[in-house]
Swiss-Prot record:
GO terms for cellular component: large ribosomal subunit. The keyword Ribosomal protein applies. Keywords: Ribonucleoprotein, Ribosomal protein. The lineage of its organism: Bacteria, Bacillati, Mycoplasmatota, Mycoplasmoidales, Mycoplasmoidaceae. Belongs to the bacterial ribosomal protein bL32 family. The keyword Ribosomal protein applies. GO terms for molecular function: structural constituent of ribosome. This is Large ribosomal subunit protein bL32. The gene is rpmF. Coiled coil: none annotated.
């Protein structure tokens, strides 16, 4: 097992952990049906950017 030779400072520890944050999911409201949808994805009603992409489920 690896054992550290010196104690790491808070600054080095925090710099290492700077990329560990969870990504925030952007949520928008569909202009066509009013349901919540994730950004840059088609809604469940079949609309994307006011264009019909698929048939409604």
């Amino acid at each position: 097992m690896a054992v550290q030779q010196r104690r790491s400072s808070k600054h080095r520890r925090d710099k290492r952990r700077s990329h560990d944050a969870l990504a925030v999911n952007l949520i928008n409201v569909c202009k066509h049906c009013g349901k919540f949808k994730r950004a840059h994805r088609a809604c469940s009603c079949g609309m994307y950017n006011e264009l019909r992409i698929t048939k409604a489920k």
